[in-house]
Curated annotation (Swiss-Prot):
Record localization: Mitochondrion inner membrane
Source species: Anopheles gambiae
Binding site for O2: Y243
Entry membrane topology: Multi-pass membrane protein
UniProt record similarity statement: Belongs to the heme-copper respiratory oxidase family.
UniProt-listed Gene3D superfamilies: Cytochrome c oxidase-like, subunit I domain
Protein name per its UniProtKB record: Cytochrome c oxidase subunit 1
EC number, UniProt record: 7.1.1.9
């Protein structure tokens, strides 16, 4: 057992570990979000202290981003699918792959510890000084959170190096870059973004650490520092990070839509690759749109508004190419396809509210209101999460060699769809009416939509529990698929289900008939 799970060098086993870890962290993060909605579900105090409330909000963000979405998308799907799609026997650095995983549990432990010592880190996930300084947040909490981020960051950087090396060096003959599957492209672009952005975050939080403990003044005006410098450094990481969260999802959705449409390739395959490259590049030059309210020059604001809107172009190319891939097909309403439809629709809605927020003048009013919360939860809670659900339902027979009950999956999708929309759609109204983020209480005039929102979160929770039940039922009954349900658009399906522990003992050769 310890040989297989503790010291594993097998990409499939490590991928499975990532899935289990991500699912566990996801349950912790979901519990925190239920606490947030319980607090906001009625006027007056429930938990009481705003510090505790902000600790919950901060932990919810960190856990969902660094310990749920990234481990599942990059660690789980990436590890499982990239070697299979490339025809590679494993990742380029199998032991480093294992180390990448085993840095995450200690990292999560440090994050949880930060909530339990002193008063917790109630800084929001951005950890802005002076709130995160040694005066406003005395004690070890923020320091523990910083070390947690360091560990998670090292884990991601090592993983990124591994994926980039694997894709450069371990492709089978015949898989040229232009014929490489879109999911592999999405993962390698994600890896480059991680490699370039995480060191900047590491620098920023290390400077914060020395400001707190070693008497430096990087972010303290009293010593000639500037807290705005921290914001620039953080968001130079933070904005690429949101594209890191969604890009692997783009790759998965491309595969699912292509395969379920019965097409042999995605519409505009090369355009899709260039669109992802453009999104990755542009993601680095728009960071200050998170800072429209800190007092930048008007020409700076004009630039960041324009650059942010340009990102909508490659994103639009992807949306319309997915629709074009669907064009002319007999639509199948399989569970994976339902998730993909939900993704395309809701991600588009989230993208549109993003274009609204890109206008610096409008953002002055909407900044730090629930409109922003609604925007990023539409692209994360219904973009990233729907992509994860789509990918899991689609590749579940490959991962386990079992099938889930499709009728139940469709019911579960419907419940989840209603739940997330009921949770986050009303938040647009709250934001437009001026309800601010990160407060545990609110004027009674905001009550109705907050009650609706909290009701939606309960429905979503039920949907997630139902999904866990469906997986459990599938594993108990052990229904095996007789054969893959559709013609494959990618080579990972040309295996036994699940694949043998060591696939591609002999290098596959891909010809033009592929």
């Amino acid at each position: 057992m310890s040989r297989q799970w503790l010291f594993s060098t097998n990409h499939k086993d490590i991928g499975t570990l990532y899935f289990i870890f991500g699912a566990w962290a996801g349950m912790v993060g979901t519990s925190l979000s239920i606490l947030i909605r319980a607090e906001l579900g009625h006027p007056g105090a429930f938990i009481g202290d705003d510090q505790i409330y902000n600790v919950i909000v901060t932990a919810h963000a960190f856990i969902m981003i660094f310990f749920m979405v990234m481990p599942i998308m990059i660690g789980g799907f990436g590890n499982w699918l990239v070697p299979l799609m490339l025809g590679a026997p494993d990742m380029a650095f199998p032991r480093m792959n294992n180390m990448s995983f085993w840095m995450l549990p200690p990292s999560l432990t440090l994050l949880i510890s930060s909530s339990m010592v002193e008063n917790g880190a109630g800084t929001g996930w951005t950890v802005y000084p002076p709130l995160s300084s040694g005066i406003a947040h005395a004690g070890a909490s923020v320091d523990l959170a910083i070390f947690s981020l360091h560990l998670a960051g090292i884990s991601s950087i090592l993983g990124a190096v591994n994926f980039i090396t694997t894709v450069i060096n371990m492709r089978s003959p015949g898989i040229t870059l232009d014929r490489m599957p879109l999911f592999v492209w999405s993962v390698v672009i994600t890896a480059v973004l991680l490699l370039l952005s995480l060191p900047v975050l590491a620098g920023a939080i290390t400077m914060l650490l020395t400001d707190r403990n070693l008497n430096t003044s990087f972010f303290d005006p009293a010593g000639g520092g500037d807290p705005i410098l921290y914001q620039h450094l953080f968001w130079f990481f933070g904005h690429p990070e949101v594209y890191i969260l969604i890009l692997p999802g783009f790759g998965m959705i491309s595969h699912i839509i292509t395969q379920e449409s019965g097409k042999k390739e995605t519409f505009g395959n090369l355009g899709m690759i260039y669109a992802m490259l453009a999104i990755g590049l542009l993601g680095f030059i728009v960071w200050a749109h998170h800072m429209f309210t800190v007092g930048m020059d008007v020409d700076t604001r004009a630039y960041f508004t324009s650059a942010t809107m340009i990102i909508a172009v490659p994103t639009g190319i992807k949306i319309f190419s997915w629709l074009a891939t669907l064009h002319g097909t007999q639509l199948t309403y399989s569970p994976a396809m339902l998730w993909a439809f939900g993704f395309v629709f809701l991600f588009t809605v989230g993208g549109l509210t993003g274009v609204v927020l890109a206008n610096s003048s409008i953002d002055i009013v909407l900044h730090d209101t629930y409109y922003v919360v609604a925007h990023f939860h539409y692209v994360l809670s219904m973009g990233a999460v729907f992509a994860i659900m789509a990918g899991f339902v689609h590749w579940y027979p490959l991962l386990t060699g079992l099938t889930m009950n499709p009728t139940w999956l469709k019911i579960q999708f419907s419940i989840m769809f209603v739940g997330v929309n009921l949770t986050f759609f009303p938040q647009h109204f709250l934001g437009l009416a001026g309800m601010p983020r990160r407060y545990s209480d609110f004027p009674d005039s905001y009550l109705t939509w907050n009650v609706v929102s909290s009701l939606g979160s309960t429905i979503s929770l039920f949907a997630i529990l139902y999904f866990l039940f469906i997986i459990w039922e599938s594993m108990i009954t052990q229904r095996t698929p007789a054969f893959p349900m559709q013609l494959s658009s990618s080579i990972e399906w040309y295996h036994t289900l699940p694949p043998a522990e060591h696939t591609y003992a002999e290098l596959p050769l891909l010809t033009n008939n592929f």
